[in-house]
């Protein structure tokens, strides 16, 4: 399997990848010159890519190597800093904060729950501090570092949750939606 090949200790058999890039571009919009799809290549698609640990720093095929970047690297750095400063797991604390959410306006006559959908494998929710309008976050309940590590039940839960997210966002008027994975190394 790919996971076994990625974890191979024999360098001649190991795949040179250490992270994944997984995501969707979904939707279309109307522009004065006609319909446009949500991607530079004008496709509704789902992508899977394996990211190498290093890439050539200069000319292809020669020169020094440098670490490749994946968006999950920033999250990994934050999670490590969080543990170093608090002694706690960020994701465990994040899940606890999500479950114990309270309204910032102090009202008790309105819902305080940020969860859109949840099951035994995942939780889809509105983050307390959104970075963009209508942002939703999807988090696995188990220690799944990337899509390759997800078992069938977790992948099914991810698919179901993403479908729910697309339906919710499009019902609110969203026409162009991007989904990305922040994977571990």
Provide a role label for each language-model segment.
Residues 1-185:
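HIT superfamily nucleotide-processing domains
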